[in-house]
Every structure is written in C-alpha cells, then in structure tokens.
C-alpha cells in the first residue's frame, strides 16, 4: 500500500463513522440471541463453568473473552459494543489488505465498503452486537489466518527470488524465516478461529493446507515440513483447550450434550440447518443458484456491450461473415453495432425476467451464485498455476487467489446451496466471497477484452456499479435503522434502541422484575429473552440461555423443572417468540409441553407486559408481549404440593 491508498482508506473510515452514527445503539435485538450474548459471559464471570453449568453449542473462546472483559470493565452493553466495533474494524482492515494483494485501491475500497454495508451494518447479523460473538470472532480470526497465509506465500516468493539472484551466501534467507513465522502464526489464528466457531476454523485450516501444498510443490519433504509448521500450533491450541474442558465437564457434556462436534443433532436443529443450507429443497436451491448465475452473466453481457459501444469508433465494422475463431469474447469488438445492440437488449431482457419467475421463488441477490463462481474461478486459476509451474515461472498471486478461493468456498459450506446476502449468519461468511466477487469483475472479466480502453471501461463500469450498490444499501439501512428502532430502552447496564412494541414490553418487564423479586433472586425467561436477566442483575436458574426447539428434550425439561425447584424460582416469563424456523412454532404447545404444563400447574398468570395487555394474546401474534407467571404457594387454595406433581421420572430421580 502507498499514498494512492490514503484517500480510499479515508473514505472507508468516514463511511464507518457514518454507519456508527446512523445506527448508534440500534444494533441489537434484546429478544433473539442477544440475551445469550449478554448474560452468558456474566455467568462465567461469576465462576460458573461453560458447557456444564451454562450450556453452549459453540467454541469456548468468545464467552470467556467477554467474561474477561466484564471482569475488567464491568458488565455493560458498552463493553459488548466496544468488542463489536473493534472486531468490525479488524475485519474491514483485513478485507482491504487482502483486496490490495489482488487489486488496486479503487476496487479494494469497493470490496471493503461492500463488506461494511452488506455485513458489518446489516440489521440482522451486524458486527457491533451480533447474534453470536463466536461467529464474529471466528470471522475475524479466520481472515487473520488467511492474511498470514497470504503473507507466507509472498515471503516464500521473495525468498525464491533472492536465492535465484545468489544474494544469500549461507543459511536461510530472512524472507524465508519471516515466511515460516507467518505460517506458524496463521496456524495459531486458525486454531483460535476453531475455538470460536468450529466451521470457521475449518475454513482457515482448509486454506492453510492448500497454501502449504501449492507453496511446497513438487518437493514432498518441504511440503510436509511446512504443513507441520501450520498444523501443529492449531492442533496444540484446540486439543489443549478442549482437553482441559473435557477434564472438567466430561465427554458426554462436551461432545454430545453441547452439540459442539455436530453429534446427535436434534431433529429441530437438523431442520433449521437444512433450511439455512438449502438442502431442505435441493433441486429448487440448485435451480435458483443457476438462475442467479445466469443473471450475473446477463450483467456481464450488459457491461461488455456498453463498454464496446463506448470505446468503439463507428467506422470499425467487420465483414458480414466471421470465422469461428472471430466469435470469441476477446474479438467481440469486431462485431457490428447492430449485433452489439441486440446482445445488449437480450441481456437486459434476461436480467429483468429471471427474478420475475415467481413459481421458482427466485432469490435476487448475486451471491446466491457464489459457489458456482468460486468453482469457476478456482478452475481458471488452477489451470494458470499448472501452466506457470510447468514453465518454471510461478506467480505468487496465482497461489494467493487459489488460497483465498478455497477459504471463501469452505466458509460457505454451511449455506452452500443458499448463499443469501440477507439473514443473520451470512454476514460472517461472505467477506472473502465479496473480495473475490469484486476481483472477478476487475481481472478475469476485464481481461477478456483485447483492447486496453475497452478493458478499462468494463472494469470502471463494474466497480462503479458495486459502489452504486454500496450507496443504495447504505441509504436503505440508514433509513431502516432510524425508522424502525425508535424506542429507547434505558437500563442499569446500558441503553439500546429497539422497535417500539419490543422495547415497551422489555421496559415493562424490567420494572416488573425489580418490583416482584429481590436483587439476587432467580428469574426464568423462556424460550428467549435472558437479556432481562442481564439488565436486572437477576440470575438465570436454568442451564440454558435459550430454550427454543431442539435444546430441551424430555430429560432436559425434567432437569429444568428440578432447577426451578431447587433455586426456588418464583417468577417465570414466557416471551412471544414464534420459532417456525425450527419447525415447532409455539413454546408449550408444539415443544416443551412437559415444562409448560408444570409451570401452569405451579404458577399463576400474573401479568401481560407490552403495549397490549389483552390476556388472550397468543405466541405468534404480531404485537410483542411477555406473559408473567408468579409461583403459587404450595398447598394454597387446595392445590397439591409442588413436588407431588413433578413428572414421574423426576420423582424417581
């Protein structure tokens, strides 16, 4: 990077500050997932044990890291916001740095700004208060590992150049030593990414294996040596940390009950993951992917024809008959104006008609086609690598593109048939794909044109369209933040702006909890919403922070009942959280029936909290509410003692 980067880095910084300003304190949803991210580290800071005392389905890195921050700075939303802002800045810096390895300052800035507004500031899945800090930290550490792998490849290339010039008289060159250090650090970063979120660490490991194989080829011994330098740090970190946790909580809790290694997944979570990945309707997903690829192709044709029309002189017309060789894209400048206009019209027609195929429910985002584009780019670059290797003129940039492509494709594994630009999870999977999407327009696509002026025009139009999309997305998100998140929820641990009905219900619930319970008295919130525990300082008596479908089987429900009994929990809150994305929709009706039946037998409904206090509201209604249950005294009004109406298996235990 050089002085040419300064104005574009400044633009990125200004855009980030603007994004923070328009979205300030509007990042989180106090109901879905964020409660876990707030309250779980607080429980760890109070010396509870992850996986055994506090159930967790991701790696241990992020909860313990945020627990450490709580111990240092105190539990507050400001601590979580700061974590998110710093992580977002790190991700954006890595995206720009990686982009500059492949492109000039302008397209690199376009890619970084795309990640900023498509991922970092997206309402569902933003980086500041994410649905999961494990995903955020996994994304940052995965990109850090990727950047270190790229640095390793560059330094290996510099080492070869120095050796060829006979500058090094003895020993290992400085570039080679620095390359080895980068490789070791890349392995350590990959290990940390795996400790944050397993699949993100696996993407980094996949990229590392490919980088080592390509850099070491054809020397097998050197390849094995380089592989050890990458794999050993990752393995030591992962095995060491999980070995310690295993000694504390046992194999059953770590491997099966936590779902950490994707073992014994409940059918509800299998259903959810199929929907996320596109395997719930694979044929339709593949059709949509192909349709998105056709639409991207139509955009390419539009850019190509416009570039040709802008850069051709009108007198440059070819004969009426063309040879087969003259029909290649690089020779498209020889086509007549009529042919070019016809291609433009056809491309526009395809671009417009594809999304209108409503029967197939076409996705409109270009990233739906990303797996196909990545496979095509990988094939193109691997073919180039083979040619360069055979000629003895290997270019490090070819290896870098291949390594980044492998990382991007591996990152998309969980959503491989349904890569949406929307949704909460895609924000943490897309950064490398966004880099390569921009790169594909700037280099492989532009290189298809024979004339420099046409190539420049195509590149400028493509980058201009990406920047225009950034501006449009930024404007739309800014409006949504300001239009929807308008209720100021002020708590003892920070402020957040929420949608009005949700914020009003949460505010009423906070006041209700403080009136009805003591400072250290436990309060249970189901199926989601333990942000209320965090805001009020009341402990959660359950092992689970979330009790959506799949988290509590029959035995888990009975354990939850025992925990409510043993902690003498007097207040239970049930939030209006419909869970149709998991299959079963209503808590207590479609899932957790045993637990809800026990609550209704032992607790009285005492309040409806929210803008509408109608007691007949049901979970799934449009207006948000929270139903509060107060514990019925044992034996009062002729009711049975609590222990007498436990499920039989619990009484036996």
Predicted regions and their residues:
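Transmembrane-helix signature of polytopic, membrane-embedded enzymes
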Residues: 95-123, 139-140, 329
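Membrane-interface transmembrane helices that cradle and orient dolichyl/undecaprenyl
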Residues: 142-185, 218, 292-311, 324, ...
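Hydrophobic/aromatic-rich transmembrane helices and adjacent perimembrane loops
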Residues: 202, 363-379, 402, 411, ...
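Membrane-lumen/periplasm interface segments of specific transmembrane helices
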Residues: 19, 227-272, 276, 287-296, ...
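Extracytoplasmic catalytic/substrate-binding loops of multi-pass membrane glycan-assembly enzymes
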Residues: 25-40, 50-68, 75-78, 249-251, ...
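Short periplasmic/luminal acceptor-recognition loop of GT-C membrane glycosyltransferases, typified by
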Residues: 57, 205, 481-551, 558-580, ...
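Perimembrane helix-loop-helix junctions
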Residues: 2-3, 158, 169, 203-239, ...
């Amino acid at each position: 990077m050089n002085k040419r980067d300064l104005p574009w880095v400044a633009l990125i910084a200004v855009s980030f500050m603007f994004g923070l300003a328009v979205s300030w304190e509007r990042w989180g949803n106090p109901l879905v997932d964020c409660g876990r991210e707030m309250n779980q580290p607080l429980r760890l800071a109070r010396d509870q044990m992850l996986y055994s005392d506090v159930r967790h389905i991701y790696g241990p890195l992020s909860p313990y890291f945020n627990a450490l921050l709580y111990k240092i700075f105190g539990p507050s939303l400001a601590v979580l916001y700061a974590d998110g802002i710093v992580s977002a800045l790190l991700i954006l810096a890595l995206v720009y740095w990686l982009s500059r390895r492949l492109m000039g300052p302008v397209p690199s800035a376009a890619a970084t700004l795309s990640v900023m507004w498509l991922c970092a500031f997206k309402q569902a899945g933003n980086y500041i208060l994410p649905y999961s800090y494990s995903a955020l930290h996994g994304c940052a550490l995965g990109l850090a590992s990727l950047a270190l792998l790229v640095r390793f490849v560059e330094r290996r290339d510099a080492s070869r150049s120095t050796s060829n010039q006979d500058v090094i008289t003895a020993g290992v060159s400085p570039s080679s030593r620095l390359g080895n250090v980068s490789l070791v650090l890349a392995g350590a970063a990959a290990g940390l990414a795996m400790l944050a979120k397993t699949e993100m660490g696996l993407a980094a490991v996949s990229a590392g294996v490919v980088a080592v194989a390509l850099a070491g080829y054809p020397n097998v011994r050197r390849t094995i040596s380089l592989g050890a330098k990458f794999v050993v740090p990752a393995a030591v970190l992962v095995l060491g940390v999980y070995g310690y946790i295993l000694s504390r909580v046992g194999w059953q809790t770590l491997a099966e009950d936590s779902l950490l290694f994707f073992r014994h997944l409940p059918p509800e979570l299998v259903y959810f993951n199929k929907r996320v990945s596109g395997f719930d309707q694979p044929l339709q997903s593949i059709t949509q992917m192909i349709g998105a690829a056709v639409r991207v192709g139509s955009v390419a044709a539009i850019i190509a024809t416009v570039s040709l029309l802008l850069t051709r002189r009108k007198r440059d017309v070819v004969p009426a008959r063309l040879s087969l060789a003259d029909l290649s894209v690089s020779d498209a400048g020889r086509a007549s104006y009529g042919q070019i206009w016809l291609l433009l019209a056809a491309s526009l027609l395809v671009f417009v008609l594809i999304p209108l195929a409503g029967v197939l429910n076409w996705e409109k985002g270009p990233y739906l086609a990303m797996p196909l584009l990545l496979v095509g780019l990988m094939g193109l670059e691997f073919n180039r690598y083979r040619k360069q290797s055979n000629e003895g003129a290997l270019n490090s940039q070819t290896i870098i593109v291949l390594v980044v492509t492998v990382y991007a494709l591996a990152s998309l594994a969980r959503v491989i048939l349904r890569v949406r630009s929307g949704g909460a999870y895609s924000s943490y999977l897309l950064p490398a794909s966004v880099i390569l999407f921009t790169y594909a327009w700037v280099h492989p696509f532009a290189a298809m044109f024979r004339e420099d002026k046409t190539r420049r025009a195509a590149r400028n139009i493509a980058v201009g369209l990406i920047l225009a999309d950034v501006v449009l997305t930024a404007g739309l998100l800014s409006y949504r933040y300001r239009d929807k998140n308008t209720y100021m929820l002020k708590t003892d641990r920070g402020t957040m702006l929420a949608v009005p009905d949700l914020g009003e219900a949460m505010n009423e619930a906070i006041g209700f909890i403080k009136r009805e319970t003591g400072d250290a008295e436990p309060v249970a919130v189901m199926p989601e919403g333990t942000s209320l525990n965090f805001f009020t300082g009341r402990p959660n008596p359950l092992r689970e922070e979330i009790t959506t479908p799949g988290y509590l089987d029959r035995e888990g429900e009975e354990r939850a009942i025992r925990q409510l009994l043993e902690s003498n929990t007097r207040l239970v809150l049930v939030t209006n959280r419909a869970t149709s994305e998991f299959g079963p929709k209503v808590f207590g009706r479609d899932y957790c029936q045993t637990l809800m039946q026990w609550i209704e037998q032992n607790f009285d409904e005492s309040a409806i909290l929210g803008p509408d206090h109608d007691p007949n509201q049901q979970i799934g209604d449009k207006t948000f509410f929270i139903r509060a249950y107060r514990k019925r005294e044992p034996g009062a009004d002729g009711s049975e003692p609590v222990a007498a109406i436990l499920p039989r298996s619990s009484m036996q235990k």
